[in-house]
Amino acid sequence: KYADLFNLTNSLGDLISSYSHGMKQKLALISAFIRHPKLLILDEPFVGLDPESALIMKNLMKELCDEGGSVFFSTHVLEVAEKLCDNVAIINKGQLVANGKMEDVIGDQSLEDVFFEVARKNVNINE
């Protein structure tokens, strides 16, 4: 199922060393989903993905959450976090400077605006 979704079915017999970066990323993501986990912890899951695969990945993450699961992921693309996440944590220079429900953290701003505000001021908005 997942190999078909990510268009890897025809390459499954090939050596992984022959895969492109994007294909390796897809394979890693498939391996994360294949056992139908209730919790996924992903580091930069969209890096190396083409737009179609990124959309598939977002839909799979939403589907997992809709079924009662949870996804924790890191990203440097704040727009992705803002669109996908119910809860968010902002880390600046290794320090947790904001966390909570997305709407509580950002208010009427964008996540990017909040990030730069706390990064410039080097403050913790949870205090």
Locate the predicted segments by residue:
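ABC ATPase "signature
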Residues: 99-100
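Helical segment within the ABC ATPase nucleotide-binding domain
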Residues: 55-67
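Conserved ABC ATPase "signature" region
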Residues: 1-11
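Catalytic Walker B motif of ABC-type/P-loop ATPase nucleotide-binding domains
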Residues: 40-44
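Conserved catalytic motifs of ABC-family nucleotide-binding domains
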Residues: 36
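A short, surface-exposed alpha-helical micro-motif characterized by mixed small hydrophobic
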Residues: 81-83
